[in-house]
């Protein structure tokens, strides 16, 4: 009897690993029609419901206040959201997968690579390697974990039309992977405006609920905001829209444990302080994007094909720099 209970507990533990399908709520006494309404509104996992504020559920047609409270109460039972000891949290952190960048020096700087379950922002001028790093990561995330990969698919949202599948094939060849398999494992979408960019995240959520993804790339997260909103009069609306987009990205990272990589552009500082600054460029998006990204990397040009990556902001990495190179087969180490 005790053994049976032990196996049941193990099975439950296994089921609780990773995102749980929204249909799980039906077993908790939630009406199937209500579950369907949640799914139609973009909630594909129990985690998505548990992390959502009640106000968001009340916006769904046919969900009353009483229903919303019951749904949230049941979701909270399935998703651990209370306090935990720092020991347990430390244990969970030690199991986080890092995705290799293709450059040993860069991986050493990042203490393993791009962290899953959080947002990494890369910013810099044009030709500093942002898009090339994204292309390399879209392949390395498919590698087995013992080879510095994430054993999952990649999702690529392109806002500037700079995605090139032939770059992925060159990187795949370097790692001895089948080119056609690598391309099949990358879901690509071109975003045409800021609303479309946000809409694509709802589709991303549905796809992640069905298949194992390790990485979500948005290149560039801010380019369309610079054109869709102009002047100071629209600044407040732009920042609110951007904040909502970044919040959705963070929720996807929390919900599915994917690594989210966003690229950002820089703007020249034209105020009085610019003449005293060593480098008068700063990332756009202001404080909103600064607070949303967990790790911020500043990329700049070196000599020839070499580039320099600096940790600009991170909760646990020291401020340091590393050199890498952009080669024909993706990002690699700089040759001395």
Swiss-Prot record:
PROSITE patterns in the record: RECA_2 (PS50162), RECA_3 (PS50163)
CDD domains with a match to the protein in the record: Rad51
Biological process, per Gene Ontology: chromosome organization involved in meiotic cell cycle; DNA damage response; DNA recombinase assembly; DNA strand invasion; double-strand break repair via homologous recombination; mitotic recombination; mitotic recombination-dependent replication fork processing; reciprocal meiotic recombination
Alphabetic keyword roster: ATP-binding, Chromosome, Cytoplasm, DNA-binding, Nucleotide-binding, Nucleus
One example GO MF annotation: ATP-dependent DNA damage sensor activity
GO cellular component: chromosome; condensed nuclear chromosome; cytoplasm; nuclear chromosome; nucleus
Limits of the HhH domain: 45-74
Function as written in the Swiss-Prot or TrEMBL entry: Plays an important role in homologous strand exchange, a key step in DNA repair through homologous recombination (HR). Binds to single-stranded DNA in an ATP-dependent manner to form nucleoprotein filaments which are essential for the homology search and strand exchange. Catalyzes the recognition of homology and strand exchange between homologous DNA partners to form a joint molecule between a processed DNA break and the repair template. Recruited to resolve stalled replication forks during replication stress. Also involved in interstrand cross-link repair.
Name of the protein in question: DNA repair protein RAD51 homolog B
